[in-house]
Amino acid sequence: MKSAIVALALALALPAAAQSPVVTVKESPRWGSFQVSLSLFSPDIDSEFTNAVHPPYATIFGTGRPLMVQAQFNKSVWITEYGTLDIGVGAGFWEAWGQGYYQGTDGTVIRGGSTSLMIIPVQAQVGYRFEWFYERFNVPLEPYVRGALLDYIWSTSGQSGVSSWTSPLDGVSYRGSGATFGWSATLGLAIVLDAFDTSLSRQMDYDVGINRTLLFFDFTRSSVNDFGSTKSWQLAPSYWAWSAGLQFVF
């Protein structure tokens, strides 16, 4: 009797199971990405004052590295099973505060009022993210490379606004603001956070269209002196600058 009841239950369950649809969840189509990053930054302005007893940048602003904040927006132009090629634009903000000075007749440094140097880095970039490890083996690591053309918009300010100076020799006025061009090359590694919580990843994709979230770390080498002009400051760091941030792929 028990065998007959079990057989009947199985017979009733099989049609229902056969009719149950199998749902396959796929990522939404990719369009591009948005990222934000933080880095410690210090321009190499003093590189042209190698013999100076009091190099101007270090004397005024010190040897610290204030925080630079940057954001980038990318369009994915080529997506394959191996990786993604992106083109995009970016901008950021950086500012250092210090105390102005002038040199007395006896050579001593005399401190003046507070002053600042502000830089707004603007860039156009192209990058490639190698996604094969994650796509093929589910290893949540994506190395990437990026190259960029840079435009650093800068200004120096004192207590009364943007700094200006008139030469006593020829009467020419100089204003403490301008734009300097350059380039950068970046090597980095991104961690695919979706691999650690796939259900949350699918929900974010369904709700807002973000189909991948990356935590990245990279190192950048750059030069910002109007491509070697002797009339321009070197506004890039003298070292490989690190940065870290989040990238949202949508």
Residue locations for each model-derived region?
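Cleavable N-terminal export/targeting peptides
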Residues: 1-29
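Short glycine/proline- and aromatic-enriched beta-strand/turn motifs that initiate or cap beta-hairpins
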Residues: 18-78, 227-236, 247
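Short loop/turn motifs that connect adjacent beta-strands in outer-membrane beta-barrel proteins
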Residues: 20-32, 76-85, 131-141, 194-213
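Hydrophobic, lipid-facing positions within transmembrane beta-strands of outer-membrane proteins
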Residues: 32-34, 65-71, 120-126, 143, ...
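Outer-membrane beta-barrel pore domains and translocons
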Residues: 39-41, 90-94, 148-152, 190, ...
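Extracellular/periplasm-exposed beta-strand and loop segments of Gram-negative cell-envelope proteins
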Residues: 43-65, 94-122, 153-183, 224-236
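Gram-negative (and chloroplast) outer-membrane scaffold detector with strong preference
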Residues: 69-159
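Predominantly the C-terminal beta-signal and adjacent terminal strand-loop region
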Residues: 190-250
